[in-house]
A protein has these predicted regions:
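Short polar catalytic/cofactor-binding loops
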Residues: 38-41, 185, 501-504
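Short, histidine-centered active-site or binding-site loop motifs used for metal coordination
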Residues: 108-110, 143-145, 243
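Feature activates predominantly on carbohydrate-active enzymes
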Residues: 1-127, 133-137, 169
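Catalytic-core regions of glycoside hydrolase
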Residues: 12, 37-38, 75-76, 80-81, ...
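Conserved beta-strand positions in the central sheet of alpha/beta enzyme cores
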Residues: 64, 140-142, 275
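C-terminal functional modules
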Residues: 304-487
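Disordered, acidic Ser/Thr/Pro-rich linker "stalks" and the adjacent N-terminal cap
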Residues: 480-529
Length: 529
C-alpha cells in the first residue's frame, strides 16, 4: 500500500492517478524497525502510537518493546502482570501495530534475578501467556547488561528452547523468538572456541534469532563483523544498531544521516533482522529512522544523504530548509566512553578550518569569513522558523532547548567573525562582548535544562563538533588581539595552579573548550601549590 501511495499523483477532486506498470518490490531484510532499548525515561504511550504509524508509513514492520526502566519488563516485576492501566495501553499498542502491519514484539529481561529452576523458567512462559492474552504475538528475551548466574549461556539456551517448544510452537500464531545475548558485541565476546556464543550457536533452535550490536556496543555494522559472529551463532544475526540512541551522550542530539552500514555483496544475507535503538526523544529520532527504513528495504540502492534530506522534507514540509540547517549541526555524540562518533557540519567544516588556520597566523580570508558568517546567520534564522513551522509540539518539547541554544550559537558566531574582521579595536571589542553574551545565553539554557525536575537531566550541546569550538577559538584569538590594544598591556593567558601526581591532561582545564574538563583523582598535598 505504501508503494501505491508513493506512486500515486492527485487528480482533480478526490481522485488519484496511478501509472501503468508492474511493481517488483520487496525488502532486503525481513524484520526492520526499532528496539526501544535505551536507558532513560521510556517513551510515552502517545509517542509509541505515533512511532507505530510512522513505521507503517515507511515500510518498517518491527517494534521491540524493551525499555530498560520498565520494571514489568525487567526486574523486579518481570514475573508479575502489568497493572490494569498499563495492560490496556499495551493492548492498544498491539492493535495499532497490527493496523500498520507492524509486529509488536514484547521483550522480557529476566536475567538480573532469574533462578535456573523449572519454576522460574515457567514464570517466563507464564508472563508470556499474560502478554498473549493482551494480544501480543511476538516475543523476545533479553540477557544484556547482567552479571552473575543469569549470564550462563547453557541455561539461557535451555530456557529459550523451552519457550520455543512449550509456547511458540504450541500457539501456532506466534512469530519466531528473538533473544539478546549477554555477549552481544565482539568486544565483550569470549573469542575462545566452545565458549558462550558457540554454546548458543550449537544449542539454540535454528528458528531463534540472536541479536548483535556489532564489533562493540556502539559501532558501524560491517560485513566482516557479521560474518565473524554468524559463524559462531550458526545463523544470520539480528542487528541491534545503537544509533541514534543517546543514553551515553544525553547532552547531544543524533539527528544525522544513516551511514556506516554494510552494503557489499553478502551484506543482506548476513542479517536476520535490523532494528535501531533510538533516542529517548521519539520525534527527533524519526529523522534517522527514515534513513534506516530506506536502507533495510533496499541496501544496494540506499543513498544515505538523499534519504536523510528526503526524510527531513517529509517530516517537516513547511520548515524543511530550516530543519536541514539544524540537523546539519546536530548529529555528533561528542566525546564518549564508547568512542563512537558521527560527522557534523560537513559542508562548512573546510571553511571553518581555513578561517581558523588564517586567524591563528593573524590573517583574514575575506571570502571564507563571508561564507562562515553566512552559515552562522542561517543557523540563527533557522530557529524561529522551526518553532513556527515545524508543526510538531511533541518535537519542540523534546528539542526546544537545543533549538534555543542553536539560535544563540548562530548569533555568537556572527559576532565572533565580525570581531575578527574588524580593524578598529574598540569596535572589535564590542562585537566580542556580543559574542560572549550569546555564549553566556547558551550556557544559561543548558544550565536551566540540566536543573529541570526530571530523572534523566542533561546539559544542552549544539554544534559541538565544529561550530561551537570555532566560536570559542575565534573569541580567544580576537581577545588576545583586541584587549592589549585597548589596555596598552599584553594579555595574560590563564595557567593551572595545581600540580602533583594527577596533572595528566590538566591543560584541558584552561583550553577554552567549554565541553572539556579535567579532574584529579588525588587529594591535594603539601607543596602541590
Amino acid at each position: 500500500m505504501q508503494t501505491l501511495r508513493q506512486l500515486g499523483t492527485k487528480a482533480g477532486g478526490e481522485g488519484v492517478i496511478l501509472p501503468v506498470g508492474e511493481i517488483i518490490d520487496w525488502p532486503d531484510i525481513e524484520f526492520r524497525g526499532t528496539v526501544e532499548g535505551f536507558y532513560g525515561t521510556p517513551w510515552s504511550h502517545e509517542a509509541r502510537l505515533s512511532q507505530l504509524r510512522f513505521y507503517g508509513q515507511n515500510k518498517m514492520n518491527t517494534y521491540i518493546y524493551g525499555p530498560k526502566d520498565d520494571p514489568y519488563h525487567s526486574s523486579p516485576h518481570w514475573r508479575d502482570p502489568y497493572p490494569a492501566d498499563q495492560a490496556a495501553q499495551i493492548r492498544e499498542l498491539v492493535k495499532v501495530a497490527k493496523e500498520n502491519h507492524v509486529d509488536f514484539v514484547w521483550a522480557i529481561h529476566p536475567g538480573k534475578d532469574i533462578k535456573w529452576t523449572e519454576e522460574d523458567m515457567n514464570n517466563v512462559i507464564k508472563k508470556f501467556e499474560m502478554m498473549y492474552k493482551l494480544g501480543v504475538r511476538s516475543f523476545a528475551v533479553f540477557f544484556d547488561d547482567i552479571f552473575g548466574e543469569g549470564k550462563r549461556g547453557d541455561m539461557q539456551a535451555l530456557l529459550l528452547n523451552k519457550i520455543n517448544d512449550e509456547f511458540v510452537k504450541v500457539k501456532k500464531d506466534v512469530t519466531p523468538l528473538v533473544m539478546c545475548p549477554t555477549e552481544y558485541n565482539r568486544g565483550w565476546a569470549d573469542p575462545k572456541p566452545g565458549t558462550y556464543l558457540d554454546i548458543l550457536g550449537d544449542r539454540l533452535d535454528p528458528s531463534i534469532h540472536v541479536m548483535w550490536t556489532g564489533n562493540s556496543v556502539c559501532h558501524d555494522i560491517t560485513l566482516e563483523g557479521q560474518q565473524w559472529v554468524n559463524r559462531r551463532i550458526k545463523r544470520p544475526s539480528y542487528v541491534w544498531w545503537n544509533f541514534p540512541v543517546t543514553d551515553y551522550c544525553r547532552s547531544n542530539l543524533c539527528m544525522g544521516r544513516v551511514y556506516g552500514l554494510a552494503s557489499e555483496p553478502g551484506a543482506k544475507e548476513s542479517m536476520g533482522g535490523f532494528v535501531s535503538n533510538p533516542m529517548d526523544k521519539p520525534e527527533a529520532s524519526k529523522v534517522s529512522l527514515f534513513g534506516l527504513a530506506d536502507y533495510s528495504w533496499n541496501i544496494n540502492g540506499f543513498k544515505s544523504d538523499e534519504a536523510w534530506k528526503e526524510g527531513v522534507r517529509r517530516l517537516f514540509p513547511k520548515a524543511a530548509e530550516a530543519m536541514q540547517v539544524f540537523v546539519n549541526h546536530n548529529s555528533d555524540q561528542g566525546p564518549n566512553g564508547h568512542g563512537y562518533r558521527r560527522e557534523e557540519s560537513v559542508e562548512i567544516e573546510p571553511v571553518v578550518k581555513r578561517v581558523l588556520e588564517a586567524a591563528r597566523e593573524g590573517k583574514i580570508e575575506k571570502k571564507d569569513t563571508a561564507l562562515l558568517k553566512k552559515e552562522f546567520a542561517r543557523m540563527a534564522a533557522a530557529a524561529p522558523v522551526i518553532r513556527a513551522k515545524a508543526n510538531n509540539p511533541r518535537l519542540m518539547k523534546e528539542i526546544g532547548a537545543w533549538v534555543d541554544a542553536f539560535e544563540q550559537l548562530g548569533h555568537a558566531g556572527q559576532h565572533a567573525v565580525a570581531a575578527l574582521e574588524e580593524n578598529n579595536a574598540r569596535e572589535a571589542a564590542t562585537r566580542l562582548v556580543q559574542a560572549t553574551q550569546a555564549l553566556a545565553a547558551m550556557d544559561g539554557i543548558s544550565r536551566r535544562h540540566n536543573q529541570e525536575g526530571q530523572l534523566y537531566r542533561s546539559a544542552v550541546k549544539t554544534g559541538s563538533r565544529v561550530m561551537a569550538p570555532a566560536v570559542n577559538e575565534l573569541a580567544d584569538i580576537v581577545s588576545k588581539k583586541v584587549f592589549p590594544a585597548i589596555a596598552g598591556a599584553p594579555a595574560l593567558s590563564p595557567k593551572p595552579l595545581v600540580k602533583g601526581g594527577s596533572m595528566d591532561k590538566a591543560e584541558l582545564f584552561c583550553d577554552g573548550d567549554r565541553g572539556s574538563f579535567w579532574h584529579s583523582g588525588a587529594y591535594g598535598q603539601p607543596g602541590d601549590w
